[in-house]
Structures are given as C-alpha cells and as structure tokens.
Amino acid sequence: NLFGNNSYVYYYQSAFRPPDGWHLHGGAYEVVNVSTESSNAGTNGCTVGAIYWSKNFSAASVAMTAPQNGMSWSTGQFCTAHCNFTDFVVFVTHCYKSGPGSCPLTGLIPQNHIRISAMKSGSLFYNLTVAVTKYPRFKSLQCVNNMTSVYLNGDLVFTSNETKDVSAAGVHFKAGGPITYKVMREVKALAYFVNGTAQDVILCDGSPTGLLACQYNTGNFSDGFYPFTNSSLVKEKFIVYRESSVNTTLELTNFTFSNVSNATPNTGGVQTIQLYQTKTAQSGYYNLNFSFLSSFSYKASDYMYGSYHPSCKFRLETINNGFWFNPLSVSLGYGPIQGGCKQSVFANRATCCYAYSYNGPSLCKGVYRGELTKSFECGLLVFVTKTDGSRIQTRNEPFTLTQHNYNNITLDRCVEYNIYGRVGQGFITNVTNYAINYNYLADGGMAILDTSGAIDIFVVQGEYGLNYYKVNPCEDVNQQFVVSGGKLVGILTSRNETGSQPLENQFYIKIINGTRRSRR
C-alpha cells in the first residue's frame, strides 16, 4: 500500500500488474475525519481476550494507529482491537491468564503469541495464532470494506468474499497511546506503475489536480489550456419563501357523548354494568364534549359511595384543559352509585370513574358480595381508562402551529433551491447593483423565468429594500485548467467567483500548491 502524507491510503491486489504508466483503478481511501483517544481502560488495566471498547462508524475504511514505537501486548498497554462489519467482527488480542472469567472469547492463548479471530453471532469461525516475533508490538489495525479486509501492522490478516462498510471499530488499551482513528471514504485513483508496482497516486477526489488527471487519464501535462467538466456535488439546499410566516391549524377530533335513554340496569356485580358509546383516542388532539352532564348531579367520593378517580387529577368538566395521555378511552355505563365506581376501578374495568345522579330508580343491583341482590339508586358512571404520555392531548380549541420563514440565500456555490415553489440546481449570484435601476416584473412580482421556464432572476425583500439574485447553471462550459511549467497553476472561468481576477472576458482563479506529487 501507499500512504500520502496521512491523507489517504492506496491498496491494490498483488495480481494487478498493468503495463508501465498511468492507470485508473479503485482501491484508494481518502481520510475524511481524524480523532485521537488516550485511554479507555480502568485503573486495573484493560481486559484481554474480549471486546470491551467500540466506536460506531459508517465508513468505507477505518484505520487505528498507535504511536511510532507501537504498544506492547500486555494489560498495561494494548489488549484488543477489532473491526465490526455488521454481520461479523474481526479482532486481534492476547490472553495468557487462566481461571474463571479469563479470556472469555478466545480461551487461553499461549504466552508470546497473539490471536486473530473472526466471530459471527457469538461463534468464532476463524482463528489464527501468531508468535509475537512476527508482530513484536501493536502498531495499527485497518478495516477496509473491499472484501472485508483487515490489516495488522500493514499485513493482510483477514479477508472474505463479502464487501461491507465498517459499522464499528475500536482499540481497548490502558497506556502507550494515543490511538489515532482515521475515517476514510473510497475514491477512484490514477496510479503510476513501474514494473507492476505503484509508484505514485493521484486521487480522483474532486480537487483541481484530481479533476484534471482523472479526466485526461494521465498525470503528465505539457503547458497549455485543458477544458474540463465536472458534476458538482450539491451539499446545500435553501428555500425562498413567499410568506414570512405560515400558520398551520392541526386537526381537532371531537368526541361527543350523550345520554342513553334506554339503558338497562346491572343485574349484580360490576361485570354486568353494560358499556355504551366507547370512544378511544389514537394520536393527535381531541375535544371531549360532555355538555349533556349539565342535567346531572356530580357525586363526590364518600367511602363506598359516588365517584372514584384518585389517578385522575381532573374532573370531566376540565378534561379538555391540555392534558396529555397515551392512550385514552372513555365509556358510559349505568349502575349503582353505591360502590359502582370504586369497585369498577378495583376490578380494572377503568382507571377512573365519575358518578352522576339523575334521581334514577332504585333498580340497580349491588356490586359487593352480600349485596348482589339488593337494589340501589341507578346513576350514570363515566369510565376513563388512560395512562399519561405524549401522543394524545385534550384541548378546548384547535392547535395552531406558526412557522417563521427566513430567507438565507447561499451564494457562489452550486446548491439545490426551492424558489417560490420552483425547484432546481443553480449557482446563485447577487445582481442587485446591476438590476436596481431597471423595472423588473416577475412571476407574481417575484421572479423572471427564462425561455425554458426555469428561474433566471428572482427578487427577495430585504431589510433595506429589494435584493435581486441571478440563477446560473452549476457547470461552466467555458472552464479550463491552466498548466505552466508542468504544474497546474490556475483555472479560467466565465464566472466572477470570490478571489478571481478579470482576464479579458473571463476570470482567472489562481491555484496554490497545484503541483502534482513527484513519483517515488
């Protein structure tokens, strides 16, 4: 493999032996994030023969490197390093201890040896024991998605016929660090081969050097102008709104309850109290209408008599005052005011029960043993079954959500846009100074369209007046690289970008450090 100033690593299979010269080939991994870690073990040292520390990733490759001198195979320094490819884990460890709880994954490993293993669903399916004379100290472990390859100190120690991204990796260690984590993405590369061996690499990473070399399939250029095209990777998106704020009224579901005129009395016990008008809330906003209760008389809890709702801190008259539930169900029943509510809650027929009198006949039977055949005054019982939560809210009126819109225009780069409902990609420039003296009429007074119907110029109300913006194509068909003295020195473009210099009817952008790396 080839390393490029810690910014990339390049792998190629030993069977890949092209003729001398430049060749476009995969296998390059560009570093996109670097972090370090000093230690992750407790005061007693790290645990060997086990995976105890892991960091989550979603990457084509992850390299974990120790300082140049490496780390010793001991509980005082290095214990375990691993690569997680989601379906299986590859790890390297050592374990010379014996006894209960020691070496939980590998079992006892001979002294002065290390173990390279692969595990799937808790079962080891690959084991390789290597003497430490081959790897005197731990220096690096790299996980690569291509054929799920794992490299220990630069040597390929595991591969399979699957290609999967790295989902997690980590080094469990006590001292000898720090460990440097390098997260990489896969890119194509233009490699220079001599006698079947790669001597230099140029990444096709969207940089000026990469665009020029990978488009022309060579790293050697004579002086001149080189037209090029590139597809812009759009990373940003903005929206231009017609309104500064928008009100959205969310749906309020109404549950209306009414008196049941033909309800039959219970015949003894709470299980014979028939339920009516059961309504169950799902998620959202609800209004429960109990207006018919105005002709009923609420009966407070009095030992066995009346209502029973210690788990509900509200009355039915106030249930719509913004209470949160998850879930909520309400039913009506007609039963004895004497004991009907309390016994229903004890029997888990409801969380809370509210009793109301309508001066009904004494036709309802008792609910307690010994009173099942006795007659008591019938009343209206309202059963509420609920748990507190965040999916259901009661309200007296619909909920209105106000969204405040801010027009933040992204300039001088290719972006995805949504301008007054029209979407597309473009390179946005501010043309207020050029347009201010003209009378621009627009699509509803806000935009000018070109012949294709796409937005050409649009206007936004700013703090100090109207601002005009022009939408240009993301790709400049007139752009050219400038090579002088064998070096990439600049770009000619028709766009007036930040830092550019006017040159006749075009603009020149100087490239700093545009020299291609020398071949090794």
From Swiss-Prot:
DNA repair listed as a keyword: no
Extracellular side: 1-520
Function field: S1 attaches the virion to the cell membrane by interacting with cell receptors, initiating the infection.
Glycosylation sites: 5, 33, 56, 84, 127, 146, 161, 195, 220, 230, 247, 254, 259, 289, 408, 430, 496, 513
Signal sequence, renumbered to the chain: none
PTM: Specific enzymatic cleavages in vivo yield mature proteins. The precursor is processed into S1 and S2 by host cell furin or furin-like protease to yield the mature S1 and S2 proteins. The cleavage site between S1 and S2 requires the optimal sequence [KR]-X-[KR]-R. Cleavage is not necessary for virus-cell fusion.
Entries under InterPro entries matching the protein: CoV_S1_C
Keyword Glycoprotein: yes
Protein name: Spike glycoprotein
Entry keywords, A to Z: Cleavage on pair of basic residues, Fusion of virus membrane with host endosomal membrane, Fusion of virus membrane with host membrane, Glycoprotein, Host membrane, Host-virus interaction, Membrane, Viral attachment to host cell, Viral envelope protein, Viral penetration into host cytoplasm, Virion, Virulence, Virus endocytosis by host, Virus entry into host cell
Cellular component GO terms held in the UniProt record: host cell endoplasmic reticulum-Golgi intermediate compartment membrane; membrane; viral envelope; virion membrane
GO term, biological process aspect, one: virion attachment to host cell
Complex formation: Homotrimer; each monomer consists of a S1 and a S2 subunit. The resulting peplomers protrude from the virus surface as spikes.
A Pfam family: CoV_S1_C
Family membership noted in the UniProt record: Belongs to the coronaviruses spike protein family.
Organism superkingdom: Viruses
